[in-house]
């Protein structure tokens, strides 16, 4: 508006690639959440809130079906990625257990997609 009112021109360019919004595949999310719940995980963080930070997973999600789920760390005090308190959540026996659960979830979800062609439709 200001450029138009003063007769000035404005030009700009991005100095790096932009991050696209996340296009989460609803079917994959539902399958993965159900699998996580079967494995005893119930602390999901809802995706309708504004996320802090940025990621290229949004770009990926526009190129292929993507499933992105955030889980609560249940840490006290709360721990968020990229801060020192988060290190306690990603080291030690609990971290290895969570890695095993995540691996099982991805494998079982992929198996369901392969065995049920209606999911891909």
Predicted regions and their residues:
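Metal-dependent amide/peptide-bond hydrolase catalytic core
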Residues: 1-121
């Amino acid at each position: 508006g200001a450029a138009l009112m003063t007769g000035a021109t404005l030009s700009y360019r991005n100095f790096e690639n932009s991050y696209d919004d996340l296009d989460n595949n609803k079917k994959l999310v539902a399958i993965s959440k159900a699998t996580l719940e079967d494995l005893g995980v119930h602390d999901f963080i809802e995706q309708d809130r504004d996320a802090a930070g940025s990621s290229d997973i949004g770009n990926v999600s526009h190129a292929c079906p993507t499933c992105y789920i955030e889980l609560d760390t249940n840490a006290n005090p709360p721990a968020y990625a990229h801060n020192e308190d988060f290190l306690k959540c990603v080291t030690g026996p609990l971290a290895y257990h969570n890695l095993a659960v995540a691996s099982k979830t991805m494998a079982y979800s992929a198996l369901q997609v392969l065995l049920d062609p209606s999911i891909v439709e």
